[in-house]
């Protein structure tokens, strides 16, 4: 059995097992005996959407505008393609190089090469009513859009999540659940993070936003949902001005340092 620290879910702790076909049933039955719970493709699809992972036929392959979706339209391409000299030449290298250079310029808000990468896949969050579905047209109120679609939803659904209490390191995952409609969209490359959009859902335009990510994996063993409309934490109450509190803290640190230097005996051999 080969075990790889890879996956298609975005979870910080997860593995893929590779075994001979003849052994697959044994491993399946054994994992079930040990408490594993099987899930269907629907669960996998919601997880990969949360992690902004592409799926062929949605974020890769044919585009609804005609032609194929460029490789560098998918954010993960920057990790998958190498132009190192030792790689040598390969089929498609020149085209990928043009896309890569356009991608770099676009990241710096330089759209001079946008013709080589006119659209990109980006995560979107629906703040209005409804559920995102593949093919829904996306609009922008910016003048340059001229009222025309600036892209379309490539993947979308309603996804459950566990609600949390507290902030930062004190965050606690509760048993209470919520739902949110998120997805991925193929958008004009001039659109970037925090861009306000409108998505046509069965004839009604609903507000949406481009986000950096739907989940974060910084605190294993669980991912945390990122909710753009989550209220910001209240600023900590402080009776004294910050400058005075900082000065008092520095004074305490200095006194502690002198105490350790001159009034303590080092008992460590």
Would you name each region that the model predicts?
Residues 1-117:
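Glycine-rich, acidic
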Residues 6-8, 126-128, 176, 263-266:
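Short Gly/Pro-enriched turn/cap motifs at secondary-structure boundaries
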Residues 28-31, 135, 250:
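A generic alpha-helix structural signal
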Residues 43-52, 203-204, 213, 266-268:
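A glycine-rich phosphate-binding loop feature that marks nucleotide/adenosyl-phosphate handling sites
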Residues 71-242:
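Glycine-rich, small/acidic residue-mixed loop/short-helix segments
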Residues 234, 241-269:
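N-terminal glycine-rich, Lys/His-bearing helix-loop that initiates the first secondary-structure elements
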């Amino acid at each position: 059995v080969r075990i790889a620290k890879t996956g298609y879910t975005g979870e910080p702790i997860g593995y893929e097992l590779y075994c001979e076909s003849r052994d697959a049933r044994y491993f399946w039955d054994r994992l079930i005996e040990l408490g594993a719970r099987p899930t269907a493709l629907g669960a996998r699809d919601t997880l990969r959407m949360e992690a902004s992972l592409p799926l062929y036929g949605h974020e890769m392959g044919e585009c609804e505008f005609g032609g194929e979706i460029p490789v560098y339209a998918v954010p993960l391409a920057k990790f998958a393609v190498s132009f190192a000299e030792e790689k040598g030449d390969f089929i498609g290298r020149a085209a990928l190089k043009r896309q890569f250079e356009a991608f770099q310029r676009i990241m710096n808000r330089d759209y001079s090469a946008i013709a080589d990468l006119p659209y990109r896949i980006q995560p979107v969050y629906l703040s209005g009513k409804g559920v995102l579905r593949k093919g829904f047209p996306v609009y922008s109120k910016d003048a340059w859009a001229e009222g025309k679609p600036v892209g379309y939803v490539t993947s979308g659904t309603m996804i459950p999540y566990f609600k949390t209490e507290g902030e930062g390191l004190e965050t606690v995952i509760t048993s209470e659940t919520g739902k949110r409609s998120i997805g991925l969209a193929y958008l004009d490359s001039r659109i970037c993070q925090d861009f306000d959009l409108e998505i046509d859902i069965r004839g009604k335009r609903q507000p949406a936003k481009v986000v950096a990510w739907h989940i974060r994996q910084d605190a294993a063993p669980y991912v945390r949902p990122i909710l753009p409309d989550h209220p910001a934490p209240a600023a900590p109450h402080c009776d004294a001005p910050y400058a005075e509190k900082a000065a008092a803290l520095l004074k305490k640190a200095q006194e502690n340092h002198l105490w350790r230097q001159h009034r303590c005996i080092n008992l460590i051999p």
